């Protein structure tokens, strides 16, 4: 059914137990899966089905190319040649195939299944005589097809059960976290935030800075970073976030003996909801499965600013924030750790 190819890719990437894989019709550098069952927030940021499939190497990985989004898989730079190179590098070039079946539309018809039968027969040592030819068979009745019957009655379902299950999951996870030693618990939370934000703090990141623009040379992210004053050998470095130039909080800072900077991060001050992928079905995974959220990108910018100021001044930083930027500042400071001495944040709508 729909999503089977994608789920085969993900299973092969995560679970060491499968010994052979054939994610037909979904290994592509183009469309990555149109169903909600094939997508999840954070799943493919900076990656895609080709790279996820390659995580199965060097175990046997088969697929086909059809007249759909997989049609370019055989083109250098588009997927399969790169997978083949990886397998060759691991000494198992023969363990991956992608026959050209581009004279057929998206399908799992007999020509595709015949490739799959042979692939599984060989690598699972099934011993069937080849070619494996399909034969007619009698369809099961509706009663025989049924999953639930008198011996196996259908369990409860619906929104009420969903609430019970999510409550149970929350209680289970809270109990697990609370059972951890403090340092281990701290590491779990840090890794969770690094995953959600999609970035670690890099104290040795490289930057260029010119005309009040800070550029992260690795990511090419560009941030407005403007010195408010030019204090010589300041005792502390203060970073102001979320404030517009001319704000009353900035008045008089030009004469301060401490160092003060004003930063503006990604889409700061933009009103309205963040842009989403055009799709009639509202589903976060369609947008955030491939793109960082606005919140995450703002934290990325803050991490860059913190790293840069820490490098050039070698002093702890004091962060001043509006209510709108409070959460982003707290997360960035948490991930950065030592460079941040103090946060002075105005109240937000949530605090």
Put a short name on every predicted segment.
Residues 3-4, 8, 12-13, 255-268:
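Carboxylate/His-rich catalytic cores and anion/metal-binding grooves
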């Amino acid at each position: 059914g729909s999503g089977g190819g994608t789920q085969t890719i993900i299973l092969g990437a995560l679970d060491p137990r499968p010994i052979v894989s054939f994610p037909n019709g979904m290994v592509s550098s183009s469309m990555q899966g149109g169903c909600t069952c094939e997508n999840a927030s954070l799943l493919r940021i900076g990656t895609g089905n080709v790279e996820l499939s390659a995580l199965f190497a060097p175990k046997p990985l088969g697929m086909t190319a059809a007249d759909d989004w997989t049609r370019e898989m055989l083109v250098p730079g588009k997927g399969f040649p790169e997978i083949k190179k990886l397998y060759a590098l691991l000494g198992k070039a023969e363990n991956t195939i992608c026959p050209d079946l581009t004279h057929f539309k998206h399908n799992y018809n007999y020509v595709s299944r015949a490739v799959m039968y042979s692939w599984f027969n060989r690598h699972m040592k099934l011993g069937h005589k080849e070619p494996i030819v399909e034969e007619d068979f009698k369809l099961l009745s509706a009663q025989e097809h049924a999953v639930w019957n008198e011996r196996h009655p259908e369990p409860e379902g619906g929104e009420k059960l969903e609430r019970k299950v999510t409550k149970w999951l929350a209680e289970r996870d809270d109990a697990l976290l609370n059972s951890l030693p403090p340092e281990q618990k701290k590491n779990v939370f840090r890794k969770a935030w690094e995953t959600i934000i999609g970035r670690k703090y890099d104290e040795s990141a490289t930057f260029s800075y010119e005309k009040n623009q800070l550029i992260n040379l690795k990511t090419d992210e560009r941030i407005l970073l403007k010195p408010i004053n030019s204090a010589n050998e300041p005792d502390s470095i203060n970073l102001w976030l979320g404030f517009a130039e001319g704000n009353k909080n900035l008045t008089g800072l030009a004469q301060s003996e401490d160092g003060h900077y004003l930063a503006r991060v990604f889409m700061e001050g933009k009103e309205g909801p963040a842009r989403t992928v055009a799709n009639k079905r509202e589903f976060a995974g369609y947008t955030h499965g491939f793109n960082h959220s606005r919140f995450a990108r703002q934290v990325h910018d803050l991490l860059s600013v913190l790293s840069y100021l820490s490098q050039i001044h070698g002093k702890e930083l004091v962060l001043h924030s509006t209510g709108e930027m409070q959460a982003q500042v707290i997360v960035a400071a948490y991930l950065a750790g030592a460079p941040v001495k103090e946060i002075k944040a105005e109240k937000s709508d949530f605090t």
